Amino acid sequence: MEIAVFGGGAWGRALAFAFGEKNEVKIISRRDLNEPLKKLNGALISKGSAPIEQVDLQRGLKAALYVIAISVQHLREWFQNASLPKNAKVLIASKGIEVLNRAFVSEIAKDFIDPNSLCFLAGPSFAAEIIQGLPCALVIHSNNQALALEFANKTPSFIRAYAQQDIIGGEIAGAYKNVIAIAGGVCDGLKLGNSAKASLLSRGLVEMQRFGAFFGGKTETFLGLSGAGDLFLTANSILSRNYRVGLGLAQNKPLEVVLEELGEVAEGVKTTNAIVEIARKYGIYTPIASELALLLKGKSVLESMNDLIRRA
């Protein structure tokens, strides 16, 4: 079966590599895919088990299944320009919350695609590990379990993909963990110790679940791969862009400098502000996200982390 992957960043390339084990894959991107990405340590998707052909949008639209790995902040504009069929079978691999409209990914997507044709990828994984064929377990959330299983069956032998519902829980967990991961990077960068880090992540998980429950997310989603699994991975590894943002902030570098040095999108930065605004609107208690938002706006990193630990 032919699968089109939209997005030529690290995540898009890794997913193209993964789906290429069992399927014919086309990748659609403005980037030159012959140019190695630092995020992937120079690995090219052409080294995968099957050749990945880069094609234009119109050719990509002829595929049977679509995988979308576009930055959340550009996702709405991308949908507007791509003009996918309303009944297209879509797996969205983007994680975050749209700042402009404070919208969840599913809210953006349903404006363009039949909700019964939408799936959302969640769970702990790094592009740099997937492109090496290292094993992981992921979750495909969808109201259409048959479609979720169809996508799951297309994943490679080194990925165990589970089909679940609870779209809102899965996407909030995937977005919120990036916020906590920044705080985790700050904690490690300041060398506050394992006890402080454990407290931060434990309370961060509770905060994620509280926020998600307000919108109907299920507790078991936050305790599983989509929530705790993704959080513990992202908040503890140098492979995480959001974690590296925290490390940079811990060195008292201005956010602009940290992001410039990163050279990649760290969704957690903008997601933090979106979460705080949503929480303020609905009266949801989000102490870690709220304190992190102040840090991102220039508050002293030591003062911010001390306040965060005391409040968390």
Curated annotation (Swiss-Prot):
GO terms for biological process: carbohydrate metabolic process; glycerol-3-phosphate biosynthetic process; glycerol-3-phosphate catabolic process; glycerophospholipid metabolic process; phospholipid biosynthetic process. Gene3D superfamilies: N-(1-d-carboxylethyl)-l-norvaline Dehydrogenase, domain 2, NAD(P)-binding Rossmann-like Domain. Keywords: Cytoplasm, Lipid biosynthesis, Lipid metabolism, NAD, NADP, Nucleotide-binding, Oxidoreductase, Phospholipid biosynthesis, Phospholipid metabolism. It is found in: Cytoplasm. NADPH binds at W11, R30, R31, K95, A127, R241, V265, E267. It holds the Pfam family NAD_Gly3P_dh_N. Belongs to the NAD-dependent glycerol-3-phosphate dehydrogenase family. Catalyzes the reduction of the glycolytic intermediate dihydroxyacetone phosphate (DHAP) to sn-glycerol 3-phosphate (G3P), the key precursor for phospholipid synthesis. This is Glycerol-3-phosphate dehydrogenase [NAD(P)+]. It comes from Helicobacter pylori (strain HPAG1).
